Amino acid sequence: MRALYPGSFDPLTLGHLDLIERGCSLFGEVVVAVLQNPGKSPAFSLDQRLEQITQATSHLQGVTVTSFNGLTVNCAREHHAQLILRGLRAMSDFEYELQIAHTNRSLDSEFETIFLSTAAHYSFLSSSVVKEVARFGGRVEHMVPAVVAEDLKRFFNSAL
């Protein structure tokens, strides 16, 4: 079975990576789909995020890294995914993700959304929190894969 895991991943966190690993274990294949969102100003370019995820998942079998714009269900169909994988950190995530899942279902009833709760030790993580910590010189090695930690240091050092 193939799961689509969509997101902006700006940057990829260890919480994201944990979900990818667990998704591979449960479903066999995970397509990590990086959203090209023209409405956002990401810290990392699309190519950088694709490379970060590719490097961080190189130890896993069954991971494909791609990008998309537009509707998640169209990306899922294009990559022959049977389900959409999403992570939940808190109840606030659930309310938002449930709304998106219902929207996706209304667009194409073929796709189910599977929610996995985040591992407790990653429940505080978000890409926004990671960038904020890195911006002020805090350690992020326990929050992101090594390749991302190095890229964050370079990004914020060059911004000074």
Swiss-Prot record:
GO terms for biological process: coenzyme A biosynthetic process. It comes from the Bacteria. The record marks 16 as: Transition state stabilizer. Keywords: ATP-binding, Coenzyme A biosynthesis, Cytoplasm, Magnesium, Nucleotide-binding, Nucleotidyltransferase, Transferase. This is Phosphopantetheine adenylyltransferase. It is an enzyme of class 2 (transferase). SUPFAM superfamilies: Nucleotidylyl transferase. Belongs to the bacterial CoaD family. HAMAP family: PPAT_bact. Reversibly transfers an adenylyl group from ATP to 4'-phosphopantetheine, yielding dephospho-CoA (dPCoA) and pyrophosphate. Its cofactor is Mg(2+). PANTHER family: PHOSPHOPANTETHEINE ADENYLYLTRANSFERASE (PTHR21342:SF1). It is found in: Cytoplasm. Its EC number is 2.7.7.3. Pathway: Cofactor biosynthesis; coenzyme A biosynthesis; CoA from (R)-pantothenate: step 4/5. The keyword ATP-binding applies. ATP binds at residues 8-9, 16, 87-89, 97, 122-128. Substrate binds at residues 8, 40, 72, 86. GO terms for molecular function: ATP binding; pantetheine-phosphate adenylyltransferase activity. Homohexamer. It comes from Synechococcus sp. (strain CC9311). CDD domains: PPAT. It catalyses: (R)-4'-phosphopantetheine + ATP + H(+) = 3'-dephospho-CoA + diphosphate. InterPro entries: Cyt_trans-like, PPAT, Rossmann-like_a/b/a_fold. GO terms for cellular component: cytoplasm.
